[in-house]
């Protein structure tokens, strides 16, 4: 055979081998000129591949619809397309350069492409959203990140041909790798309730940084792996978590699991995400702390130290005392004499009143005219409105509240008692007058009950008119009066240590400022009235609590002026407050203290007058409450209360209506439900609701008012949570608010 024939035969053999190679799927032709695109090239190294071009990854998904259109034209099942539809290799027509005639053979050897490994990794690599695409792409798309091992190795051999021995060796190595235990893949399951992973929302500023890191990854791998034989297959897990209520994805992380380095990198990414989240939380806490700190500083600036208040008034605290008792018991006379003895009224003024009273035929009433400034009160000799006067001693500042004793003006007495700290119950020892005031229907008994109900827990019982010729400082008469009173006051609720009895003479002043002379009453060695009041302990003043002032009266004097006692907190000139229940915001323009002088501030326990801006006088009413804006007083129409029935001729049942007096407010109230009956002695609640209530019973009931009323729970603010019920001109029950409904 000639040399030319041998060359021709060798050429034909080579040509035949090339044709077989093109037809056989086991060794498809490799064309270096065609760029091989492999998804996520950071995990699959191809020596002959061109450097990764940014934006090509978006083409992987952006041309999905176009690739699906070519699927029917080529008649080629896409799930066998060399590891997934993403491996386009420049287009569908170019990816099958060997033709379609051996399509079945191609499918039978598809294990070379790594589809057996697909079944092993399916559980871990499932995309979970593959139903959004055509079912024909379920397998290929879920495993698009698993580059077939056989194809990588074939491409690594370059453009040369592969012998049968090399193919068998390659297939054996592929099977051995497929049979090995898959490496653990680092997973981040954000939907699991048992795995606590940081959920980080990617900021827009961070996205370009992440893309650059992914773009630089192939170059790093190419530098590291210079020899094709050292290339390793990398398996990545991409987890996309989309919150159902969020407008943007919560997290998107890639975790390669081929080497410890990639695992460490993933751990660093998680740690970085956790650090970012921790930084955001700490920043939020810091801002919150700054806000809270500013609010705290502002609140501390508004708070007043009690020592500062004492220094403002020379260390003297304030006390409001109310003179109460039956009509003609001598209340106004005693109050006027106290003002004269303490220097609040000068001698010249008293002499003037004495001359005027003598001319009017009321010679013995001149001291009462100091308190009764109204002409009608002076003519009739009885107090109609609650008179207010101010005096000082060496230890304290006092406001006298002179309550009317007549039963027609009991409402005014209740309003005055609600503003008092200490009660002075004036009892006339003159024969006939004591019996009229203390027996049934007398105002001495009712005033004692009303004082207790309105929070007057300290009571001084002064037996007045001991200088009267019918008494003449008699010890027997004094003991007769005090014995009956002590038993009655104990039944009302006063403890033994809360009540003090003393004999006085309001007209002569004996026992008011100085002690009773031993010549007149050798049997009494107790203190005088002012001596006892100066030494009496007072309740703690809550000057830094929310401001509350029940309005007792109103007037128009160059604006709207209201008057009342500050029950809680303090007020400053220029401060904004809220009038409840009409929720009107007002500004305090002027503050007048007890001496009618202007002041910059006023504190809990003081009787003040405030000029307000922002509201008209006709929009106010007695019983409204001036409170702080941040903590306004509660306004309700229904509430639950504990009620003790003191005097009731008939029975009380659901639907019963009466008049309620609470602080300075007067409202009509109706019993809507009787809940429990309280057992005597233990106050244990009955399981069955009572059908009615009568005198002497204690019950829990639900009351409803016709108009909104400003009240608080008795446990929170006792001065705004106690009330009195009156019907047909008499007090029938007392109570306290237990729950607001």
Curated annotation (Swiss-Prot):
Q: Which PROSITE patterns match?
A: G_TR_1 (PS00301), G_TR_2 (PS51722)
Region annotated G5 sits at 505-507
SUPFAM superfamilies of this UniProt entry? EF-Tu/eEF-1alpha/eIF2-gamma C-terminal domain, P-loop containing nucleoside triphosphate hydrolases, Translation proteins
Residues of the region (G4) are 464-467
Q: List the disulfide bonds.
A: none
Name the segments for region: Charged: 162-311
Q: Which UniProt keywords apply?
A: Cytoplasm, GTP-binding, Nucleotide-binding, Phosphoprotein, Protein biosynthesis, Repeat
GO term, biological process aspect, one: nuclear-transcribed mRNA catabolic process, deadenylation-dependent decay
Q: Where is this region: G2?
A: 381-385
The modified positions for Phosphothreonine read 399
Protein residues bound to GTP = 325-332, 402-406, 464-467
- Where does the UniProt entry say this protein principally localizes? cytoplasm
Extract the Gene3D superfamilies matched here.
P-loop containing nucleotide triphosphate hydrolases, Translation factors
- Domain of life of the organism encoding this protein: Eukaryota
Stretches the record annotates as Disordered? 59-186, 199-264
Give start and end of each tr-type G domain: 316-541
Q: What does this protein do?
A: Involved in translation termination. Stimulates the activity of ERF1. Binds guanine nucleotides.
Belongs to which family? Belongs to the TRAFAC class translation factor GTPase superfamily. Classic translation factor GTPase family. ERF3 subfamily.
Fetch the PANTHER family from UniProt.
TRANSLATION FACTOR
- Its recorded name reads Eukaryotic peptide chain release factor GTP-binding subunit
- The species this protein was found in: Ogataea pini (Yeast)
Q: Which gene encodes it?
A: SUP2
């Amino acid at each position: 055979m000639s040399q030319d024939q041998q060359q021709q035969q060798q050429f034909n053999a080579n040509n035949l081998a090339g044709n077989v190679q093109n037809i056989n799927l086991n060794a498809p032709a490799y064309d270096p000129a065609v760029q091989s695109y492999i998804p996520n090239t950071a995990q699959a190294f191809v020596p002959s591949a061109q450097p990764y071009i940014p934006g090509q990854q978006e083409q992987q998904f952006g041309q999905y619809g176009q690739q699906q259109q070519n699927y029917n034209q080529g008649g080629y099942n896409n799930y066998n397309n060399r590891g997934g539809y993403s491996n386009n290799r420049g287009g569908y027509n170019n990816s099958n350069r060997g033709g379609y005639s051996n399509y079945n053979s191609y499918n039978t050897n598809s294990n070379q492409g790594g589809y057996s490994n697909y079944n092993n990794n399916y559980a871990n690599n499932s995309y979970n959203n593959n139903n959004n695409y055509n079912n024909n792409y379920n397998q290929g798309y879920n495993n698009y990140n698993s580059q077939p091992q056989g194809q990588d190795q074939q491409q690594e051999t370059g453009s040369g041909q592969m012998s049968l021995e090399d193919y068998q060796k390659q297939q054996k190595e592929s099977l051995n790798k497929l049979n090995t235990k898959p490496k653990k893949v680092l997973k981040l399951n954000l939907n699991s309730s048992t795995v606590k992973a940081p959920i980080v929302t990617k900021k827009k500023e961070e996205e370009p940084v992440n893309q650059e890191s992914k773009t630089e990854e192939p170059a790093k791998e190419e530098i590291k792996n210079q020899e094709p034989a050292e290339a390793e297959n990398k398996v990545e897990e991409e987890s996309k978590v989309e919150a159902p209520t969020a407008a943007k994805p919560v997290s998107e992380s890639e975790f390669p699991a081929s080497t410890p380095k990639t695992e460490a990198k993933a751990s660093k990414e998680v740690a970085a995400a956790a650090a970012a989240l921790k930084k955001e939380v700490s920043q939020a806490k810091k801002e919150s702390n700054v806000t809270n700190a500013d609010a705290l500083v502002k609140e501390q600036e508004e708070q007043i130290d009690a020592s500062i208040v004492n220094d403002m008034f020379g260390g003297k605290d304030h006390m409001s005392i109310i003179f109460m008792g039956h009509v003609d018991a001598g209340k106004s006379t005693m109050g006027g004499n106290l003002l004269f003895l303490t220097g609040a009224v000068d001698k010249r003024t008293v002499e003037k009143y004495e001359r005027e009273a003598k001319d009017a035929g009321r010679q013995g009433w001149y001291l009462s005219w100091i308190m009764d400034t109204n002409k009608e009160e002076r003519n009739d000799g009885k107090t109609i409105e609650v008179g207010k006067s101010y005096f000082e001693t060496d230890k304290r500042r006092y406001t006298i509240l002179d309550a009317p004793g007549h039963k027609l003006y009991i409402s005014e007495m209740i309003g005055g008692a609600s503003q008092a700290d200490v009660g002075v119950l004036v009892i006339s020892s003159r024969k006939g007058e004591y019996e009229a005031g203390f027996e049934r229907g007398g105002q001495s008994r009712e005033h004692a009950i009303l004082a207790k109900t309105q929070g007057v827990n300290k009571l001084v019982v002064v037996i007045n008119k001991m200088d009267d010729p019918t008494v003449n400082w008699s010890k027997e008469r004094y003991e007769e009066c005090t014995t009956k009173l002590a038993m009655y006051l104990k039944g009302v609720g006063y403890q033994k240590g809360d009540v003090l009895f003393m004999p006085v003479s309001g007209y002569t002043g004996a026992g008011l400022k100085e002690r009773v002379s031993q010549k007149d009453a050798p049997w009494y060695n107790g203190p005088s009235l002012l001596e006892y009041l100066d030494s009496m302990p007072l309740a703690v003043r809550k000057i830094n609590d929310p401001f509350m002032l029940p309005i007792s009266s109103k007037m128009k004097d160059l604006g709207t002026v209201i008057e009342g006692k500050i029950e809680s907190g303090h007020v400053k000139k220029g401060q904004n407050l809220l009038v409840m229940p009409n929720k009107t915001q007002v500004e305090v323009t002027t503050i007048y203290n007890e001496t009618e002088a202007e002041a910059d501030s006023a504190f809990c326990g003081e009787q003040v007058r405030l000029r307000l801006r922002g509201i008209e006088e006709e929009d106010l009413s007695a019983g409204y409450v001036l409170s702080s804006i941040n903590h306004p007083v509660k306004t309700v129409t229904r509430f639950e209360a504990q009620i003790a029935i003191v005097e009731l001729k008939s029975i009380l049942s659901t639907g019963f209506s009466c008049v309620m007096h609470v602080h300075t407010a007067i409202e009509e109230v109706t019993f809507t439900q009787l809940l429990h009956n309280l057992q005597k002695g233990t106050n244990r609640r009955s399981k069955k609701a009572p059908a009615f209530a009568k005198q002497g019973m204690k019950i829990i009931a639900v009351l409803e008012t016709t108009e909104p009323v400003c009240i608080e729970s008795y446990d929170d603010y006792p001065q705004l949570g106690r009330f009195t019920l009156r019907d047909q001109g008499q007090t029938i029950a007392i109570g306290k608010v237990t729950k607001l409904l």
